[in-house]
Amino acid sequence: GSEMCIRDRCSSVMGLGGFPASHKLFLGTLGMHGAYETGKTTANADLIIAVGARFSDRVAGDREKFGENATIIHMDIDKAEINKNVKSKFSLIGDLKDTLTTLTALCESKSNPEWLKEISDWKAQFDKTPEYNSKDFAHAYHIIESVQKLTTADDIIVTDVGQHQMWVSQKYKFEKPRTWCTSGGLGTMGYGMGAAIGAQTANPDK
């Protein structure tokens, strides 16, 4: 049902891995540290389905203007999150596995190649990765790309808090759930070492 009625997808920093980054409909993270194309897509969308999102200021920015041209459907297991930060026209409360299954069954298959082409053009135009020059210092993106080549989709990536955390969220391609450990909401400095030890203890074979 990924392509039935939803034409593109983006994620919060904490949601990375919930949808494969290699999928052609995945755009990246949204918000002040996100990709340009996700902001453009959200601003021009006619329908936004928010799944388990809380619309923090880092994601929504000016909450009064977020998705102002779109019908917003907000899905969450906690009804306290509904309309707390961004007003939605419709809401679905419950386990997301059930609510998403129900919603997908109601969707009609539609195609909008012009919209997908426009998004593709935004992505190509605003690629933030600088060209690598071995005579200069490596950019953080080049280091993250190297780490990507040395790891698998099942490996767990842990960061601390700061600029490197945002670089990883922007550039590392997470393919599976629970492979990304970071302190996004609280932003706790020093989180990384303890989280890495915990992840290794819980997953001794990784």
Which role fits each region the language model picked out?
Residues 1-6:
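Short, small-residue-biased leader/transition segments that mark boundaries at the very start
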Residues 7-12, 35, 139:
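Residue-level signal for threonine
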Residues 8, 46-48, 71-72, 155-157, ...:
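Beta-sheet entry/capping signal
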Residues 10-12, 50-51, 94, 157-161, ...:
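General beta-strand structural signal in soluble alpha/beta enzymes
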Residues 15-118:
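Glycine-rich, acidic loop regions that bind phosphate or pyrophosphate groups
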Residues 107-110, 202-206:
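Short helix-capping/linker segments at secondary-structure and domain boundaries
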Residues 120-205:
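Active-site diphosphate/adenylate-binding microenvironment
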